[in-house]
Regions:
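A short acidic, glycine-rich active-site loop
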Residues: 24-34, 70-74, 142-148
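Glycine/Thr-rich phosphate-binding loops of Rossmann-like dinucleotide-binding domains
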Residues: 11, 58-60, 128-129, 165
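C-terminal cap of metal-dependent C-N hydrolases
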Residues: 65-68, 116-167
């Protein structure tokens, strides 16, 4: 049996909600107590995976406020920096635990190979999340303007470079 949660439920709670459609997701953000229970779940192993729940939508689909915007946010590109900043740098979990939750456990669960596939990160690179830097077609993110650590410098998939950071 496995259990997963998404980065936004570990980093945000209902106190962070704004009227913007960027904050509309399903399930919605819950209480601080619920957020703390999820964090306890990743610490004690009840939750063994973190999945991004990446749901890109057009600007038009997300510009209708909380009530009428499409459900979902982008999550793939900034999951690691958000979780590294919010959970590892604050000593809630170790870097090894984060890698286990994001990579190792999902890979084992779904029988995925990792041959010649890796990412190179600069864990000291500190920056502000800006939607103009997103490669995803969707830009809806409740994390815009947040300061994070950790920039992906290179991604290699099955021996082929699929991403390389070119600088600002």
């Amino acid at each position: 049996m496995t259990c997963e949660t998404a980065p936004h439920y570990l980093i945000l709670n209902e106190n962070d909600l704004q009227e913007s459609g960027d904050f509309k997701m399903n399930p919605p953000l819950r209480s601080k107590e619920d957020q703390e229970a999820l964090i306890k779940g990743i610490q004690d192993g009840t939750i063994d995976m973190i999945a991004t729940d990446h749901a890109p939508h057009s600007e038009e689909e997300k510009a209708k406020g909380q009530k009428k915007s499409a459900m979902g946010i982008v999550g793939l590109e900034k999951a690691f920096p958000l979780l590294y900043t919010g959970l590892v740098k604050t000593d809630i979990i170790s870097l090894e635990k984060l890698i286990e939750l994001l990579n190792d456990n999902p890979r084992r669960r779904f029988g995925l190979k990792q041959e010649d596939s890796w990412c190179l990160w600069d864990l000291n690179d500190h920056y502000v999340i800006d939607e103009k830097d997103f490669l995803s077609k969707g830009k809806a993110s409740p994390f815009k303007g947040m300061e994070v650590y950790g920039r992906c410098l290179k991604t290699v998939c099955e021996g082929r470079t699929v991403y390389e950071y070119k600088g600002e």
